[in-house]
Amino acid sequence: MTEITDRYFDDLIARLTGLRGRLAEPMAKAAELITAAALADNRVYVFGTGHSHMMAEELHYRAGGLAITVPILCGAIMLQDGAAASSHFERIKGAVLPILERYGIREGDVLIVVSNSGVNAAPIEAARYAREKGAAVIAVTSVTYSNAIAKGRTQLLSLADVVLDNDAPAGDAVLEMEGSSLKVGPVSTALGVTILNAIFADVAAKLVGKGDAPIYLSANMPGSGEVNRELVARYRDRNPHL
């Protein structure tokens, strides 16, 4: 490895090690909310804009993941249909509401909202929408970043039942380079994926203890076809992306 790649690994490992202790309590609370939703046959929706939408895809139809998750996906708030346009769209008040209406979020459900900055209109309105429907809200955000840029704006962390602070710095990138004032090496995606997969592993263990853990198998594993078909049939009614 080079010096800069070593620094990236060192930074990321240090942040993950810190999260392991600091997030123990909120991660446990998040797992309890998600487990309760699963046991009541409710759903866990996952919403993010820009690169944060990858958290929704990560938890959807995932080998080793739970079938209770529903990604909230729309090209306008993702990257493939126009990255610059999506950055503009997520700041337009009211624009995300028709997207949310498609999913039928209701009382007893959980909405995970992922937003590193935690101040743009789309994640704020998603959290408010879920609360109005009686769903619990879990936020994955950078408290440092959000506090640095809020400037009186509503912050996602103020609307959540559980706040999972990913410890990403303002601006996300962590590595300084000689000869440049710019930084490289964003960390929010790696941190967010780790936090959420750890929580869902905890949930899965709890559901196994209750006798019903709807866990997907990798499509290349023996017996996966039957297992996954049964899960898709069971959960398709409230997941338009299966």
From Swiss-Prot:
Entry-linked Gene3D superfamilies: Glucose-6-phosphate isomerase like protein, domain 1
Entry's Gene Ontology BP terms: carbohydrate derivative metabolic process
Residues of the SIS domain: 30-214
Superkingdom, taxonomy of origin: Bacteria
GO MF annotation list: carbohydrate derivative binding
Similarity-based family: Belongs to the UPF0309 family.
Official protein name in the record: UPF0309 protein Oant_1457
Biological source species: Brucella anthropi (strain ATCC 49188 / DSM 6882 / CCUG 24695 / JCM 21032 / LMG 3331 / NBRC 15819 / NCTC 12168 / Alc 37) (Ochrobactrum anthropi)
